[in-house]
Swiss-Prot record:
Cellular component GO terms, alphabetical: cytoplasm
Protein name: Ribonuclease H
Keyword Metal-binding on entry: yes
Subunit description: Monomer.
Keyword Cytoplasm belongs to the record: yes
Broad class of the protein's primary localization: cytoplasm
PANTHER family xrefs: RIBONUCLEASE H1
Function noted in UniProt: Endonuclease that specifically degrades the RNA of RNA-DNA hybrids.
PROSITE patterns: RNASE_H_1
């Protein structure tokens, strides 16, 4: 069996107004090579962008990989490592029996994560972590670029 490639992924989401124009930023490192990705949406939320960033990064991988995925979003990290198990058992309902917010993205993240061996890590935002700061710059620039793309899953109450 061949050993899986080790990819370091850093992600961040940004939203101006929350809801408002938003964007995500991604930095991917593999064997000294760096790839950056970002995109923006006309109307979305910070949490949706924090979820979309790792989705896009994981979906960009062309084969199963060992991934160290670092984000400053406790919402995303706690959701994918802890809360999601209960949500799935309860038919995507919370412990309060209300529908899980951003369920379209949670399902997509869950599916993308199944293909890889992921170590989900958290880093404090705006604390000088170089890759996280770069992701923040990419996400903010995407949000500030007057994006017109529609976030199809965004609902005003999410």
């Amino acid at each position: 069996m061949t050993e899986l490639k080790l990819i370091h992924i850093f992600t961040d989401g940004s939203c101006l107004g929350n809801p408002g124009p938003g964007g995500y930023g991604i930095v991917m490192n593999y064997k000294g090579h760096t790839k950056e990705m970002s995109d923006g949406f006309a109307l979305t939320t910070n949490n949706r962008m924090e979820l979309l960033a790792p989705i896009v990064a994981l979906e960009a991988l062309k084969e199963p990989c060992k991934v160290i995925l670092t984000s400053d979003s406790q919402y995303m990290r706690q959701g994918i490592t802890t809360w999601i198990h209960g949500w799935k058992k309860k038919g995507w309902m919370t412990s309060n029996r209300t529908p899980v917010k951003n369920v379209d993205l949670w399902k997509r993240l869950d599916k993308a994560a199944q293909l890889h061996h992921i170590d989900w890590r958290w880093v404090k935002g705006h604390a000088g972590h170089a890759e996280n700061e770069r992701c923040d710059q990419l996400a903010r620039a995407a949000a500030e670029a007057s994006p017109t793309q529609i976030d199809e899953g965004y609902q005003a109450d999410s």
